[in-house]
Amino acid sequence: MVTPIAVVGPTASGKSALGIALAHKLDGEVVNVDSMQLYKGMDIGTAKLTVEEREGIAHHQLDVWDVTETASVARFQSDAVADVEDIMSRGKTPILVGGSMLYVQSLVDDWQFPPTDSAVRARFEARLADIGVEALHAELTQLDPEAAAVIESNDPRRTVRALEVIELTGQPFQASQPPKDAPPRWGTRIIGLKTTPEWLNPRIEQRTARMFEQGFVAEVEHLVQQGLIADSTAGRAIGYSQVLAAMAGEMTWEDAFERTVTGTRRYVRRQRSWFNRDHRVSWVDASGDPTAQALEILGLQ
């Protein structure tokens, strides 16, 4: 039976390159698990591989949503599970590539999403309107520090959702997620790219500089014409949020660059913390030869 391989780890650690290399070795197809690469036209700012960079490897779950759509882990899970099972039915190896934490977990674990209640949600949305997202996120931190650690303090939708789940279930938001010591769906093997700040931070700065050199601002301007606004899932993405603020005169372009770098570093710390808690991950050194290390772990070297 074909076993899927998941490639996880922090932003700028080389997941896409490792995914392509493994797909070549294992006759695989890539399933994207980066929530922002699901958006059409969000290419430069998400380091989405170009068609040429995909080297003939089929990719799934790229360019699925319009920038006006609200992201949905449940919708992604349904669509991506279907993709993985289709790839397996054709005798090919699904290579799941991405660092979006809840999206990875929704795919490799059989995550049944907790209930919703429009009245409870409306109450938290009213409180959001009253006190603002950062204050509401601080309340979440008091109730459930683990949930607050993986939800950005400027993400109103997921902050409200976490509070809704806590109230409806009487448990921490994290308790609604499957345990990370359960067998992964399909027996998926999880390969993680281990990095140090000393190695990764310069890569983040170089990647951010390259984004701006390659036309990131023009990309955002084009997406604004497609309906991108700051108060949306896509508009709150790291980099896009800062460029939109600079376009609106709310910060300088220098600040936009610096805050993209620091925002990415903050996100990387959360990714490290999240994936380090998953003992099913087999780690490879991102600064070495991760492909050779991964193949050895998989018993293919």
From Swiss-Prot:
The region annotated as signal peptide is: none
Binding of substrate occurs at: 11-16
Site feature (Interaction with substrate tRNA) residues: 100, 121
Where ATP binds, per the record, is at 9-16
**Reaction(s) catalysed by this chain's protein:** adenosine(37) in tRNA + dimethylallyl diphosphate = N(6)-dimethylallyladenosine(37) in tRNA + diphosphate
| Any Pfam family | IPPT
The alphabetized list of GO BP terms reads: tRNA modification
Q: List, alphabetically, the InterPro entries matched.
A: Dimethylallyltransferase, IPT, P-loop_NTPase
| Cofactor(s) in the UniProt record | Mg(2+)
List its EC numbers.
2.5.1.75
**Top EC class for this record:** transferase
Ranges for region Interaction with substrate tRNA: 34-37
A GO molecular-function annotation: ATP binding
Whether Flavoprotein counts among this entry's keywords is: no
Which keywords belong to this entry?
Answer: ATP-binding, Magnesium, Nucleotide-binding, Transferase, tRNA processing
Note whether Magnesium occurs among the keywords: yes
Of which family is this protein a member? Belongs to the IPP transferase family.
Q: What does this protein do?
A: Catalyzes the transfer of a dimethylallyl group onto the adenine at position 37 in tRNAs that read codons beginning with uridine, leading to the formation of N6-(dimethylallyl)adenosine (i(6)A).
Q: How does it assemble?
A: Monomer.
Q: What is this protein called?
A: tRNA dimethylallyltransferase
Source species of the chain: Corynebacterium glutamicum (strain ATCC 13032 / DSM 20300 / JCM 1318 / BCRC 11384 / CCUG 27702 / LMG 3730 / NBRC 12168 / NCIMB 10025 / NRRL B-2784 / 534)
Q: Which lineage do the record's taxonomy fields give for this organism?
A: Bacteria, Bacillati, Actinomycetota, Actinomycetes, Mycobacteriales
Gene name?
Answer: miaA
